[in-house]
Amino acid sequence: MTGNILGEKLTLTSFGESHGKCIGMVLDGCPAGLPLSESDLQIELDKRKPGQSLITTQRKEEDRVEILSGIFNGHTTSAPICAIIWNSDSDSRPYDVIKNSPRPGHADYPSFIKYGGFADYRGSGRFSGRLTATMVMGGAIAQKLLRYTLRIETIAYTIQIGKISYTSSSFQQSKQNRYSNDVRCPDPQIAEKMKSAIVDAKKDGDSLGGIVESISVGLPAGLGEPIFSSLESDLSKALFSIPSVKAIEFGSGFTGAKLKGSENNDEYEISEDHKITTKTNNSGGILGGLSNGMPIIIRIGFKPASS
């Protein structure tokens, strides 16, 4: 295993470099018959496309996806699905100047030692945030597969930038409002404060970190495995693959570590539709590495951009 493949039954292989000809992914294990087209991937790619505002990278890329295999007559065939994006806006000249001077906070030094200076350093190569586009392509398919087969839905949104934070409300409100602003925060007023904080830091030649919250609903109880293949283990591996992620918590997380057991426990109850639920969700929907039927709640901490 070289670190470029994620998953077991459904595997995602990421390839390409930031300033190479293209970046792409291969998703293997998707069953036949799922309605799928390039537009399904493009909708998600457009949400992360660079250059959309003054607070994102100013690199201009169209990020138009091309599906090369695995789709026929608008449906998956069960063959590996390969999709690529061509790189077009890559000025590598600044990287020639710094190639022998490791930048603080970047992977320059450890990658130079590991690969003996042969790694593609342009735009940070395989360590670039641009490679998240390959995850978005694979994630778009996985997301549709989960909705289509199990009616599982996942949303994510920003709850903190620097010292400015947002307390999440209902699932539906967060789902509806999260793309109404540049920082992807469901509350428009707090979003403006977050954006202003980013702009102020940028004026000072600096950057800010943040926290993203993710909620998955519709999962049945019992998904996952104990010990080394717990849901927390598998999800953490995937999420730590995103550049700049430095912290993850499930449910009450680090706050729960300050509570008593009686305060952190989630008592069971029978809901109005006769389902077993819990009164609270401090476990974040996972107990013993298995889903318990409650929403899975994850928070991911991102360090400030290094340059």
Please annotate each region the language model reported.
Residues M1, R103-F118, L208, S262-E272:
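Acidic-glycine-rich active-site phosphate/pyrophosphate-binding loop
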Residues M1-R59:
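N-terminal, positively charged regions that mediate nucleic acid binding
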Residues F15-K21, G205-S307:
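Glycine-rich anion/phosphate-binding loop at the beta-strand->alpha-helix junction
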Residues K21-G33, R130-I152, A156, S229-K237, ...:
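Alpha-helical support elements that line or immediately flank enzyme active sites
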Residues E44-P104, D108-P110:
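Glycine-rich, N-terminal phosphate-binding loop and its surrounding beta-alpha-beta segment
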Residues L45-S53, I85, D89-D91, I113, ...:
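Structural signal for hydrophobic packing residues in well-ordered secondary-structure cores
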Residues G51-G70, S165-Q173, N177-Q189, D266-T280, ...:
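A structural-propensity feature for long, helix-poor, extended segments
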Residues K114-I227:
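Glycine-rich, mobile lid/loop segments that gate access to catalytic sites or pores
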